[in-house]
A protein has these predicted regions:
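Short beta-strand edge segments in extracellular beta-sheet folds
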Residues: 55-59, 137-140
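Extracellular low-complexity, O-glycosylation-prone stalks/linkers
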Residues: 87-106
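Beta-strand-rich modules
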Residues: 23-50, 90-94, 112-132
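Proline-enriched interdomain boundary motifs that mark the N-terminal boundary
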Residues: 63-71
Length: 272
């Protein structure tokens, strides 16, 4: 038995106190603690009988502090993410979640080799399996030399072209959207009719050399409808069902959709 604490008797018929548990219940195991009471009196010590003992458990459901992403950088296709975290006494590890994998680490950095496109966010996890809120997400987008047709699943609150393109500033020479465009001018910045990047839009990103665009923000709202007008529309697809075939993705448009064009690929609908 482990002694927890003592309280003074003051002539009451009943007493109430707060007793500490020695372990917390977890997601997979409810750990009960047995309590007994010893009354120390002039006549001697009186111990509660075994069938009079109490049982209880405690749950740690306090979420850990959320890490803060501080930087993302790359060399060739190798990307490094860094974050700050105020260490708490019950800290267990950080969980890094991406579109295709989950990694755990006790450090404040994570590195990976980019294969086309990925998005990462971090949670801190404590010994009792509690997760912090998600950090902001970091989107990593590989770009080939020349023109690249891309859309954005992650955007910062400041979605200006200057902010979104900051990581490739100097290498990027132009961005073209539907009916809008902007060119990068050294010592001046971005100039043109394209002021901001939106979740519904698709864009041609033009770069001098192979690069990676790194953008920090939050996943875009998947419920926003992207309106289509008659003719050609330059839009993004930011929700992909298990069946992401062209037939399924455009099924809601019926016979109204006659064709779709991507970067270096295209498909036309032929009746009959």
């Amino acid at each position: 038995w482990t002694s927890l604490h003592s309280i003074a008797a003051y002539g009451s018929e009943t007493y109430q106190t707060v007793a500490e548990t020695l372990n917390n219940a977890t997601e997979t195991d409810t750990i009960y603690t047995e309590f007994r009471i010893i009354a120390s009196m002039n006549e001697g010590n009186y111990v509660s009988l075994d069938d009079e003992n109490g049982f209880g458990y405690s749950v740690d459901n306090i979420h850990p502090a959320t890490p803060e992403l501080t930087s993302a950088e790359h060399e060739d296709m190798d990307v490094s993410l860094n974050w700050q975290y105020e260490l708490e006494e019950d800290f267990a590890y950080h969980r890094i979640t991406s579109l295709n994998s989950i990694d755990n680490t006790i450090s404040n950095e994570h590195s990976f080799t980019l294969d086309g496109h990925d998005e990462h966010w971090v949670n801190s996890v404590d010994y009792n399996g509690n997760y912090s809120d998600n950090t902001e997400s970091i989107m990593s987008m590989a770009l080939g030399q020349g023109a690249n047709l891309r859309s954005f699943n992650v955007l910062p609150d400041d979605n200006s072209i200057t902010n979104v393109m900051a990581s490739i500033e100097g290498n990027a020479t132009g961005v073209i959207g539907e009916g809008v465009a902007a060119n990068y001018m050294e010592d001046i910045g971005w100039m043109g009719s394209l002021d901001e990047i939106t979740s519904c839009g698709a864009y041609w990103l033009i770069v001098n050399e192979e690069d990676i665009l790194l953008t920090t923000g939050y996943p875009t709202d998947r419920t926003i409808p992207c309106e289509l007008h008659a003719g050609a529309n330059l839009i993004s697809f930011y929700v992909f069902p298990e069946d992401n075939s062209v037939t399924n993705m455009l099924s809601s448009l019926g016979d109204n959709a006659t064709g779709i064009i991507g970067e270096g690929v295209a498909a036309s609908k032929i009746n009959g």
